[in-house]
Amino acid sequence: MKNEINAVLENMTTATPEPEDYTGEDGLLYCGKCRKPKEAYFAPDKAAIFGRDRHPAECDCQRAAREEREAAEKRRRHLDTVEELKRRGFTDPTMRDWTFENDNGRNPQAGIARRYVEHWEDMRADNIGCLFWGGVGTGKSYLAGCIANALMEKEIPVHMTNFALILNDLAASFENRNEYISRLCRYPLLILDDFGMERGTEYGLEQVFNVIASRYRSGKPLIVTTNLTLDDLRNPEDTAHSRIYDRLLSMCVPVRFTGENFRQETAQRKMESMKKLITD
């Protein structure tokens, strides 16, 4: 034990010289590159305790190297955290590519999505969600994914899923139904994609209501994308849909998506590329 203590003291109190280092007029070891001391004298009372008169000190070179190592380690931990958030947060790996950086810049609602991320803390504090509604292929899901990716890059947990998957999970899971829904509601932001496309059975509608009502009670924001019109949501066909839509509209600010169908455009571009390849 005594030898171990001595080894610790030795490491604590002895600076390791490099070939270019030198001893200054004050008797301390100096860095041969930055010309700053690598040692400092103990106060007299500390010197008596350690039995030495000096201890290592960081020169500018050592400090810069340490800060670089710490920054690299911080970046690594950040990347690991973001990777884990995206692994848990996305139900489809392609959603990882739905980012503002990959956006074609032609969707006028992109600015709203960007500002939602920029003002996330306010949105979270005031429990402000969004209802992205509009025609098929107008970029609703993509921009919701952009929000998810941007927040997860800030190490904020987000879960993006749809009710078809939720209903399948509830039917297949051994987990308690209430615990499953509670887990969904623990995410700071929940994104429900393609709302209204799930099967309209009595059981399905009841679970849809349970999820949305639980999210409402959690006081946390919700983003929903749907092909339903605002008129559909405000004038539901029956009571079962009415209580779902009413709760949804109380939580989310409607944002209309109009314009070109980006999916059709992508399909047309792929068709033209294929024609070119097979006719060349």
Where in the sequence are the language-model features?
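Short glycine-rich substrate-engagement loop in P-loop NTPases that contacts/grips substrate
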Residues: 108-117, 148-189, 199-206
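A short, basic N-terminal segment
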Residues: 1-104, 265-280
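Walker A/P-loop nucleotide-binding motif
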Residues: 124-144
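N-terminal pre-Walker A segment at the start of P-loop NTPase domains
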Residues: 98-123
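Residue-level preference for the first positions of well-ordered beta-strands
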Residues: 127-131, 158, 189, 221
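Walker B catalytic acidic pair
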Residues: 194-195
